[in-house]
């Protein structure tokens, strides 16, 4: 099973022409009076693959949901057709649609934890899916098919895991289970909406190869929705680019990625960080000679005393003023545990952290070392105004009176590229990129010397990523900040970092200059991470101009 999953997808050899299986004609979708999708057209045959890309608000996920008529409340198809084998799903009565949805066309959602039922075992959920369209087959037969499905998608020891609940599986395994549920009835069309967004590079590669294998070997038509052009390059033979609800360009993936015609496609490609591009950190700032933050022998474990699971083991790190140190590793490697230890949120079990030669205690850590969170939506309290959110560290550390804090908030908003008037507004009124700027302003409020950025751009579109990265670089230049930049995207990490440290199972297995670590890795794990990064073909000369 593993050999099949790890075989690279062959998207450079599109399948031979087939009769149209899925045909979307002039699709229009609206939420109230707001048009979300306007005039989308495409066709897909058995064994063919189509990637739909675009930034947040482009309409790509709405298009995917419309294919199965699973639009959220208030959404409706206002025009066009979605034809599956000539049958218009957009016009079907709900009862007839239920017989098609899940059986002939199925969906894999972005977040398996919110899509899987947390109080039902995986075996029970597969059994329900098999019963929904499979008639009255014996329970033992359904259980055997559930095991076959889990084995097909590469879940180890499938027969032993039917009784396990979703939280007992890793993120990658949960996504495999979602794919197994979608395949329960040999669906002719599989729609995958951002199937690897939250996954690390090696797990992402496994899921992409699994989808490509299903597409190739089972003849399932595959639609992949993503904001990541590298994901589409690895998986889909054809590409459709959306912006503001409309298709701006479509065609063979290889052609669009090397010779795009539309200015928007060109701008998307130009914003994608490339692993082969050298670090830009040295041109931005020069680190100080003496380390500012020194970590020695840091250890942290979780769980009951007799069965404690180590999250960090003997971690050593140095961080200099004006330096960006990139920290990479998969989920469970200890990256976020280290971040929480440095800001004083989780005291380590062993080891020391010193700041400017002095032990870094909890209160000092909470002022000198500030955290920028991954999720710009969950990390801002929706009940507070932006001004109050940014002022929270000032209030906590009793810095300034009310008027001084208001002045500091206005200064910080302008520093991160927002209007001072934003202070009176709610976080709900801002985009993801703007919310991340607010989060950065909050982190800067008590004038820290160190920023710990925990996946600060992973939830953002590529063009917004580039803007936030440039903002962090400018702030580092102006304020002399030391930055610990935690991420799983090695291309982004190389771009922003002076040095890179690789964390694996709680230990630093390699560290060194960013360009050297990427081009000449010394540890097998680093090489494995690098090999898993989706690659884009090189654009033809002048094609992005």
Task: For each feature predicted by the language model, list its residue ranges.
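Conserved ABC ATPase "signature" region
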Residues: 88, 141-160, 404-421, 531
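ABC ATPase "signature
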Residues: 247-251, 259, 508-512
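ABC ATPase C-loop
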Residues: 177, 182-183, 438, 444
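ABC ATPase NBD coupling module
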Residues: 89-106, 124, 132, 254-260, ...
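Conserved ABC transporter NBD signature motif
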Residues: 76-88, 351-361, 365, 510
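Helix-to-loop junction immediately C-terminal to a conserved catalytic motif
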Residues: 68, 72, 343
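Conserved ABC ATPase signature
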Residues: 164-169, 173, 426-430, 434
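A short, proline-enriched helix->beta-strand linker immediately N-terminal to the Walker B motif
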Residues: 184-188, 445-449
């Amino acid at each position: 099973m593993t050999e099949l999953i790890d075989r690279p997808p062959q998207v450079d050899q599109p399948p031979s022409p087939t009769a149209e299986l899925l045909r979307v004609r002039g699709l229009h979708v609206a939420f109230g009076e707001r048009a979300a999708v306007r005039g989308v057209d495409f066709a897909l045959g058995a064994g063919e693959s189509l990637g739909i890309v675009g930034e947040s608000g482009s309409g790509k996920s709405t298009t995917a949901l419309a294919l199965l008529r699973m639009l959220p409340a208030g959404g409706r198809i206002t025009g066009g057709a979605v034809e599956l084998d000539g049958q218009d799903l957009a016009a079907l009565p709900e009862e007839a649609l239920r017989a098609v949805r899940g059986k002939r066309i199925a969906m894999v959602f972005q977040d398996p934890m919110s899509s899987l039922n947390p109080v039902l075992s995986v075996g029970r959920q597969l059994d329900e899916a098999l019963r929904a369209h499979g008639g009255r087959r014996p329970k033992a037969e359904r259980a055997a098919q559930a095991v076959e499905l889990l084995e097909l998608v590469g879940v180890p020891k499938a027969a032993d895991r039917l009784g396990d609940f979703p939280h007992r599986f890793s993120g990658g395994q949960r996504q495999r289970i979602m794919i197994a549920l979608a395949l329960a009835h040999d669906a002719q069309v599989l729609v995958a909406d951002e199937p690897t967004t939250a996954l690390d590079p090696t797990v992402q590669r496994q899921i992409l190869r699994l989808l490509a294998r299903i597409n190739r070997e089972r003849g399932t038509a595959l639609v992949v929705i993503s904001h990541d052009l590298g994901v589409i390059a690895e998986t889909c033979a054809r590409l459709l680019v959306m912006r503001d609800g409309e298709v701006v360009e479509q065609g063979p993936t290889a052609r669009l990625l090397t010779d795009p015609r539309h200015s928007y496609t060109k701008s998307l490609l130009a914003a994608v960080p490339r692993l082969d591009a050298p670090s830009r950190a040295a041109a931005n700032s020069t680190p100080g000679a003496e380390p500012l933050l020194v970590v020695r022998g840091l250890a942290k474990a979780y769980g009951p005393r007799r069965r404690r699971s180590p999250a960090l083991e003997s971690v050593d790190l140095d961080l200099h003023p004006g330096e960006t140190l990139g920290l990479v590793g998969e989920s469970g490697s200890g990256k976020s545990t280290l971040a929480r230890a440095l800001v004083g949120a989780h005291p380590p079990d062993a080891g020391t952290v010193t700041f400017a030669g002095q032990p870094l205690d909890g209160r000092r850590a909470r002022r000198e070392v500030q955290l920028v969170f991954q999720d710009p939506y969950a990390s801002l309290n929706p009940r507070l105004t932006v001004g109050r959110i940014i002022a929270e560290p000032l209030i906590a550390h009793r810095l300034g009176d009310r008027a001084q804090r208001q002045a500091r908030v206005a200064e910080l908003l302008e520093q991160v590229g927002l209007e001072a008037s934003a202070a009176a507004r709610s976080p709900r009124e801002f985009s993801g990129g703007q919310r991340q700027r607010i989060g950065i302003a909050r982190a800067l409020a008590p004038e820290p010397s160190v920023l710990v950025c925990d996946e600060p751009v992973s939830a953002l579109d590529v063009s917004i990523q580039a803007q936030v990265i440039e903002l962090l670089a400018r702030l580092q230049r102006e304020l002399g900040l030391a930055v610990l930049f935690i991420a799983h995207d090695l291309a982004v990490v190389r771009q922003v970092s002076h040095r890179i440290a690789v964390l694996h199972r709680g230990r630093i297995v390699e560290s060194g200059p960013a360009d050297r670590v990427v081009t000449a890795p010394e540890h097998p794990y680093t090489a494995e991470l690098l090999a898993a990064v989706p690659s884009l073909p090189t654009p033809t000369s002048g094609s992005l101009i």
